[in-house]
Regions:
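N-terminal Rossmann-like NAD(P) cofactor-binding subdomain of oxidoreductases
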Residues: 1-170
Length: 170
């Protein structure tokens, strides 16, 4: 939310979550779970959170695409993201649920933007014209793989030892 709230390319028009948070102001839904150094952005703090499942028709009618980052079981996430795609709404997912789905591209744009070429195959499976799901890589990978990629291309990297320490975000 903090990265998108004042971004020049995006306008947050809807926020959705589980039925537990639906109907609440975003500020109230987040409550004490807000862990950022900054305050909840003014643009979104008073927005009413919608039910991501029950309000799918309304949400997909109002948005161009969805950024999905939900705390649910993997099978529930898969179902939810596929429903949005089937409603002809592109989904860019932060979740791991579809990272091993063969026709869902895991995109690190600087490295493998061409992986989006699999989307027509996914659309055929889902029966969609516009809707699709694309996922981002694990947060750890996206920090060091862009630096390793050109080194591998130039010199051939055989082994890498990586240590990660999880942040509050998971």
């Amino acid at each position: 939310i903090t990265l998108l709230a004042n971004h020049p390319w995006f306008n947050i028009t809807s926020l959705a979550a589980s039925s537990r948070s639906a109907g609440k102001k975003y500020e109230d839904a987040v409550g004490k779970k807000w862990c950022m150094d900054t305050e909840i952005p003014e643009k979104v703090k008073d927005m009413i959170v919608r039910d991501a499942t029950a309000d799918i028709d309304k949400i997909t009618a109002e948005v161009d695409f969805v950024f999905c980052a939900v705390d649910m079981k993997k099978d529930e996430i898969k179902k939810l993201e596929e429903e949005y795609a089937k409603h002809e709404c592109p989904v860019v997912s932060n979740n791991s649920a579809h990272r091993f789905t063969p026709d869902v591209p895991m995109v690190v744009p600087e490295l493998n933007a061409d992986h989006i070429k699999i989307i027509p195959s996914q659309r055929k499976r889902l029966g969609t014209k516009r809707g699709f799901i694309a996922v981002k890589s694990n947060c750890s990978l996206q920090s060091y793989v862009p630096a390793l990629f050109p080194l591998h291309d130039k010199f051939g990297v055989k082994d890498v030892l990586v240590c990660t320490y999880q942040a509050i975000s998971g």
